[in-house]
Amino acid sequence: MFIFLFGLAAFFLCLSAEFQKAKALLRAQVFLKGKDLKWDGESCYLPENRAFGLGIAALVCVSVAQIVGNVVICRGFTKTDKTRTTIFCIILLLFSWVNFAVAVTLISVGASMNREQIYGKGWLNRECYLVKDGVFAASGFLSVTTMAAILGAFAFKVKPSLQVENHDKRHTQNV
């Protein structure tokens, strides 16, 4: 339940960041006027945006959920016998780590672009950068798929042990 709540929080924080990110009007690669962007002819300025804090919060939530989920599942690997589902669990865990890595990269870059970009310094190479539409939404989707993979691995890991316990109970009652 804890993992699910943190994953859900990361998803909604990413969606909120998508709607709060810095924006500018762009036509034919020329900035006409910006809601947030200020241009002095040779350098630009972007104030810090709420998407920065939302992105950091989403990053913390998805990281905590990933780490706690993997600790719970990996602890279960050492306590139980190896079964057929172990391979499937490992595949789900690897899938969750790949999704986690991509989600963390997108959230980190998106959040850092929404931090203050000062005149003459910018975000990278003295230029201001804006997060493209859909970056935070995609990272939210990846956060959800990461949590789904973790919960799936957990469900497949718990299910065989429950079946063994139920089988043992039925066997002792019949004797």
UniProtKB/Swiss-Prot annotation:
Pfam families: DUF1218. Its main location: membrane. Residues 74-86, 157-175 are extracellular. Keywords: Cell membrane, Lignin biosynthesis, Membrane, Signal, Transmembrane, Transmembrane helix. GO terms for cellular component: membrane; plasma membrane. Disruption phenotype: No visible phenotype. Double mutants lacking both MWL1 and MWL2 exhibit smaller rosettes with a decrease in rosette fresh weight and stem height associated with a reduction in total lignin content and an increase in syringyl/guaiacyl (S/G) monomer ratio. It is a multi-pass membrane protein. GO terms for biological process: lignin biosynthetic process; lignin metabolic process. The keyword Signal applies. InterPro entries: DEAL/Modifying_wall_lignin1/2, DESIGUAL. The keyword GTP-binding does not apply. It is found in: Cell membrane. Residues 1-24 form the signal peptide. Residues 25-52, 108-135 are cytoplasmic. The chain crosses the membrane at residues 53-73, 87-107, 136-156. Belongs to the DESIGUAL family. Interacts with CRK19. Together with MWL2, contributes to secondary cell wall biology, specifically lignin biosynthesis. This is Protein MODIFYING WALL LIGNIN-1. It comes from Arabidopsis thaliana. The lineage of its organism: Eukaryota, Viridiplantae, Streptophyta, Embryophyta, Tracheophyta. The gene is MWL1.
